[in-house]
UniProtKB/Swiss-Prot annotation:
Plays a role in virus cell tropism, and may be required for efficient virus replication in macrophages. This is Protein MGF 360-10L. Keywords: ANK repeat. ANK repeats lie at residues 57-89. The keyword Chaperone does not apply. GO terms for biological process: taxis. InterPro entries: Ankyrin_rpt, Ankyrin_rpt-contain_sf, ASFV_MGF360. Belongs to the asfivirus MGF 360 family. Pfam families: Ank (PF00023), ASFV_360 (PF01671). It comes from the Viruses.
Amino acid sequence: MFPSLQSFAKKVLARHHVSIDYHYILKHCGLWWYKAPISLDCKHMLIKLPSFADGLDLNTALMLATKENNYQLIKLFTEWGADINYGLICANTPPVREFCWELGAKYQVDKNKVMHMFFKLIHHGTTSSNIILCLKLFNNNPFPTYVIIREIKSSIYWKLRRLVEDTDILSNMSDDDMLTIYCFILALQDNLREAISYFYQHFKHLNTWWLICALCFNKLFDLHDLYEKEKIRMDMDEMMCIACTKDNNFLTIYYCFLLGANINQAMLACVQFYNMDNLFFCIDLGADAFEEAKALADQRNYFLMYHRLSIDIYSPDSSLLTLKEADPKKIYHLLKNYKSKNMMVYFDYDGHDTV
């Protein structure tokens, strides 16, 4: 689109720092967004706003303006060089779609552009700002969310399938919720605190999922905050089973143990998920359901696990039985360099047996 003289003048103004005394001029000119002046970094073509620490490239800014039905900014960003076809992705009402078409958008949303924008924002190593922005753009935005979910559904499904036994929960989950949980897992794994807080505040209907993810990804302090401060509750043994899904989840397993979860059920869950380190840790904590565990290992043809469970050499680790309350700082201090006593006993026995 060929820029108007007015948009060119606004572009010049946005490139320069304007004293707070003249902010009223920027508001009058339409260079005001998210309670702050719109600044333009022409070298990188980024919209600068305090609400978006990483800045917004023009196409992303256009999508956000379209999602908000901000006709003035849709036209301005398009005249500054944004691709109006990106705006069409977030056009949720007929009038906004028609406006995008008037500005030159194609009549169908480009699915490749949807995926390009999604993966540009959502990837390992991304930022809190990008994750929050992704949610603003795609939540309650049916068609592009549908496109994204169809593209990455298999990946999302198997990430979540390991966390819950009830497949009906996943089958009945909306595309919006599935996408939100996927983004939360990424934020949790990369410890993006601002994004994590945003999820807690804005998606309270998914609170149980936040608890599930904290258990599964061994996020002890998040688990404690959710359980004690947010008062999110689940069946204790179910929590323990989720903690056992990923190996080396000593922190969240121990937290559930101190809350009163059944350590023998945890032992069986470790066999079910074939998590050897977790299995030895449960034995360290006093699990003694060896016959049931052997039967399960035999049933699943886990020969190595069956062999290890068949040896009568194990006993609880008394150093783990000193804590009586689920204090995350004390748990972390106790386990930060922990090596399983019973695993070392086994390897010592196995070494001598081999000799």
